Amino acid sequence: MSLPIRNDSARHRDAEQPLAGDLALRRARLHEFCGPARVMLAALVMAKSRGPVVWIRPGWWPERLNAAGLQPIANPSRLLLVRADRDEAALWAAEEVLRSGTVPLVIAETAAAPGLTPIRRLHLAAEAGAEAARRDGGTAPLGLLLLPGQGGAPGVESRWHLAPAPSRSLLWSGGEIWTLTRLRARLAPPARWHLTHEPHGAERLEPLAAPD
């Protein structure tokens, strides 16, 4: 009689979403991206994920998410864009999609940092979605909250800041270099890296001095 063998390494991979290099985000939780390049960071995560992506944005913002600009990084055909008329509506939509367990990546942008209660609701929705996905053989959802400036939503699993870091050494290759900062995380200390993104999609992560 053959016995079922549990693949713990695969289970571990399914529990995390790659971010950059050996950095990863815990699924079934809500993480925060902030800084001037937060949309770029979300696009990089989207490129490493599989399945549909729901991206919720404030409907009153004049800026639009540019599918043509997204194309070199991630496939925009996977994207469902939702325009919310207020921050509360964006958070409600994110909560409902996370709870369904049918969408592996849910991205919500808001104009201001939510309070602790909405964040807790999003965590609970992501956990419920993970259970639903497990029953259906799917992937546990990951929630990303994009906030302007330094962010600051209470209770998030982790907070990441991305900003451009121009470098003459990359001008010849057409690559881009960013400063990626882990401002806080439940299971890791603050840290900082140079993240290099080349036109052909290759990435390089170089540690820097930790932020103060």
Q: Which role fits each region the language model picked out?
A:
Residues 48, 96-100, 135-136:
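Conserved catalytic network of the ASCE P-loop NTPase/AAA+ motor domain
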Residues 56-122, 150:
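Long, charge-dense
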